[in-house]
Amino acid sequence: MNTDFDLLLAGAGHSHLGVLNQWADGERPMGRIGLVSAEPHAWYSGMMPGLVAEHYQPRQCRIGLPRLCAAAEVEFIQGTLVALLPDTPELLLATGETLRSTWLSLNLGSLPWLPEQSGDGMELLSVKPFADFIRRWQQWQESPEPVAILGGGPAGAELALAMAGRVPAIHLFCAGELLADHPRRLRALALGHLQRADVQIHEHVSIQSVHGNTLIGDDGQIHWRGRRLVVATGPNPLDWLRDSGLRLDGDGFIEVSPALQSRSHRHVFASGDCASLPGAARNGVHAVRQAAVLATNLSRAAIGQPLRHYHPQTHSLALLADGQRGALMSWANLAAEGKLLGLWKDHLDRRFMRQHGNRD
């Protein structure tokens, strides 16, 4: 394969899906473009709790990348990225193959923070990558056992509600308060749903390690014994970014300008969870919204035109699945719950999939 490109898209996150969708509608830049992804499908994170709750089938929650790429006249390259040389720029794949490009866009996502583990008495299941999570969750369901979940954010709360009734017991561990970054009303609603679902909630318990079949907190105490742990902690950058030469923030994410352009390498763009932009929290809402700006800027940069800026909204709508086909909603300091919100969330999720996954 000729490994030289005019533009490479690394990763198939929500921003790049939106870019491909726009290009499929006829706004594609000139030149040879490729997309690199470790998997042939992109999973839509908003539908993962519904998939766990068996409200959806796997095929309803994933987007076939070869088909979407073909519609956008983009070459699909299946491979795992292990290194980046931004000065060239070049991408190194796990196979040893090197891809070169004039322009590079990174939408790599993030991974949950994992506690240190000693011994093999407990299986750890990270919520990302989604393909691995779904495959192993389905294996666990063949012989259900009690489960602990690490993570007091939306992902942890939604998964606990989705898993309720499908395993004998669930323990949800939060380093601080549940949904600490969300309105108090939403937190109260979520606590009520979790308690009614018999989820045992452990707030202000910071789990630091796994020893055998036990969870150990930062106080040195044992907080749970069991064999299965789901990790839905906050976003952690990919390890190899530290050695990439890109300018990173203090947490290891790629610093970008409001144009989603690397602060250190003007021919590199980044969006979604892997990028660090003041005011843009790491959630799917911003990743989806960044797609339009990114698509425009990738076209403009190649021909030397001024770039657009992405302006994060002060407040983002949050819709959390309640495991019973309803949803919890928050906007600014407002919060609500109900079946109608669940229908609305389902409509939005299915619309996203139609826009990105049903190309002839």
Each PLM stretch: what is its role?
Residues 76-84, 91, 99, 167-258:
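A Rossmann-like FAD-binding core segment of flavoenzymes
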Residues 2-4, 8-10, 71-146, 219, ...:
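FAD-binding core/adjacent interface of flavoenzyme oxidoreductases
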Residues 15, 109-112, 235-237, 325:
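Short glycine-rich anion-binding loops that position phosphate/pyrophosphate groups of nucleotides
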Residues 286-313, 319:
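Internal hydrophobic alpha-helix adjacent to the cofactor/substrate pocket in enzyme cavities
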Residues 2-74, 158-184:
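Beta1-alpha1 glycine-rich phosphate/pyrophosphate-binding loop at the start
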Residues 122-144, 224-227, 232-292, 296:
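FAD-site-proximal beta/loop scaffold in flavoenzymes
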Residues 324-360:
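C-terminal auxiliary extensions adjacent to catalytic cores
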